[in-house]
Amino acid sequence: MIRIAINGFGRIGRLVLRLALQRKDIEVVAVNDPFISNDYAAYMVKYDSTHGRYKGTVSHDDKHIIIDGVKIATYQERDPANLPWGSLKIDVAVDSTGVFKELDTAQKHIDAGAKKVVITAPSSSAPMFVVGVNHTKYTPDKKIVSNASCTTNCLAPLAKVINDAFGIEEGLMTTVHSMTATQKTVDGPSHKDWRGGRTASGNIIPSSTGAAKAVGKVLPELQGKLTGMAFRVPTVDVSVVDLTVKLEKEATYDQIKKAVKAAAEGPMKGVLGYTEDAVVSSDFLGDTHASIFDASAGIQLSPKFVKLISWYDNEYGYSARVVDLIEYVAKA
């Protein structure tokens, strides 16, 4: 059994918990969040406005949340270095705080006794891995790794398939992205990003994203060939990537569809999905794929210039990849 601890019990932390509980080879041992009491932690596991009520039983005592009869130790420690990961024999600490996302800060989990750390955010210093794209390049000497971002997890599998089959000369990505916790319910101060301070539920908000450039970190052959931006839109979950690329080799749209479908049914099964149905965003709520190619939504201008569309549940699909990466690094 892989013994894990979750630091940070927000959207991703709670969904990683839900998904990890479904895996037979993972045991969730502990949860740490300095801002959440046990009764409130249990409440937030039980009720979720986006993904629905937890179908099992949830309760708590003074030192645990209890899910389906399994006791999970709880802590309210601000400094991860003070957590008892050593005595709890933690194999992998999952850091989903968004705070301890660099090698020097995530090291606190190692200092506390965890064997390895998976960061659920992009990192400028920790090596980034996208399951299905470059995870097999992981080596056990890397104690701290990043699972990159939800958008990179959607874009990278598609970009890899297209680049391997036809070559990408250059490309631009736009993600039409659901609201997240960093946004405002009404107009408020946001000194670094003025647009980001505007009300999330009533606006389409242009925003920056490093997701496309990050693909170059997980696929070095695409370094410098992709960049992108985001539009934040008033939906609670599920986002969509629009990848517009100039190909190196000529291709028909049918050839592109066949290449993506072959990957989705073969080496990227479970990570990359494929659909030809007339779908909309809510159809992917709770989908565990990192990226679902929408074959009927893409368009082609010329044999080397295409726009490709891929959906992703930016919460659930991403959290599923976090759990996959936990399994991979723990067993490596």
From Swiss-Prot:
Residues at the active site: C150 (nucleophile)
Binding site for NAD(+): R11, I12, D33, T120, N314, Y318
InterPro entries: GlycerAld/Erythrose_P_DH, GlycerAld_3-P_DH_AS, GlycerAld_3-P_DH_cat, GlycerAld_3-P_DH_NAD(P)-bd, Glyceraldehyde-3-P_DH_1, NAD(P)-bd_dom_sf
Residues that coordinate or bind D-glyceraldehyde 3-phosphate: S149, C150, T151, T180, T209, G210, R232
Pathway where it operates: Carbohydrate degradation; glycolysis; pyruvate from D-glyceraldehyde 3-phosphate: step 1/5
Function noted in UniProt: Glyceraldehyde-3-phosphate dehydrogenase (GAPDH) involved in glycolysis and gluconeogenesis. Catalyzes the reaction of glyceraldehyde-3-phosphate to 1,3 bis-phosphoglycerate. The contribution of the TDH1, TDH2, and TDH3 to the total glyceraldehyde-3-phosphate dehydrogenase activity is 10-15, 25-30, and 50-60%, respectively. May be involved in a process other than glycolysis because it is synthesized by cells in stationary phase.
Family, similarity comment: Belongs to the glyceraldehyde-3-phosphate dehydrogenase family.
Protein name per Swiss-Prot or TrEMBL: Glyceraldehyde-3-phosphate dehydrogenase 1
Provenance organism: Saccharomyces cerevisiae (strain ATCC 204508 / S288c) (Baker's yeast)
